Amino acid sequence: TFFGNFISGQWVPSDSGATLENRNPANTGDLVGLFADSTASDAERAIAAAKHAYQSWRLVPAPKRAEVLFRAAQIIEKRKEEFARDMTREMGKVLDETRGDVQEAIDMTYFLAAEGRRQHGQTAPSELRDKFAMSIRQPLGVCSMITPWNFPMAIPSWKIIPALVCGNTVVLKPSELTPLSSVHFVKVLEEAGVPPGVVNLVVGGPAVGELLTTHPDVSVVSFTGSTAVGKLVNQNAAPHFKKVHLEMGGKNAIMIMDDANLELALEGCVWGGFGKIGRAHV
């Protein structure tokens, strides 16, 4: 099965026509799907679509944006088992853990949908006569979201849903290793009623990532991944004064003291090393 990019409400191949294979790591003979192998021109079109959609999406009342996201949470909840099984097939976590990954996306989407009615500003007394001082919350614009393979539905939800409920638009670049989970997530948003161009999906490598972090029409960059790539993202975005969020790789030390419960401590060590295929930073 071929899965294209999602740009301006349409599922389309990459401009180059190239594809990426996604295979089951536990059975490399099992081809999960073929995905668009995108170039900078694909990312350019996605950013343009997001910029255009922003002009109308930002004007949709926040409670109405939230209603769309609430519907998305309901759809994911109904299809949780399907999404979890596909996630296990494409990236290797055991089914119990991929169910948890999908559940995080459900919980985050429900929680952030409620923020549609909590985007409060502030009022303050003014030192000037006949003046009224207040602050309001406003969206920032186009947001680039670059996500890793280890939590392929939870992490996109953490980034995309807050951006959408606040009136921003999004271009998502998932890991090339786990694009199917992101395709599922974006299709859910499409089904829930997110307008064309508000969410865009581009699967690809460094050329896509570079444009998403340097393009002048991108206001926010949110990246989760390795420290080396995170440094590069920051270097790319800094000259343009973009707002940048980085969550980078970490190795958590475990110190076992003399009075520790050894059985409990060893259980923690083993879980930390092998739980969630050893890719949880806890």
Residues of each region from the PLM?
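Short beta->alpha connector loops at strand-helix junctions that form conserved
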Residues: 168, 173-175, 203, 224, ...
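Conserved small-residue-rich beta-alpha loop and adjacent elements
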Residues: 122-196
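ALDH superfamily catalytic-core signature
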Residues: 228-281
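Glycine-rich loop-to-alpha-helix module at the N-terminal edge of alpha/beta enzyme cores
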Residues: 23, 28-119, 130
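Active-site pre-lysine segment of PLP-dependent enzymes
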Residues: 182-191, 206-215, 228-239, 255-259
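Terminal low-complexity tails and localization/encapsulation signals of metabolic enzymes
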Residues: 1-35, 67, 71, 121-146, ...
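A structured beta-alpha segment of the ubiquitous adenosine-cofactor-binding alpha/beta core
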Residues: 132-133, 200-219
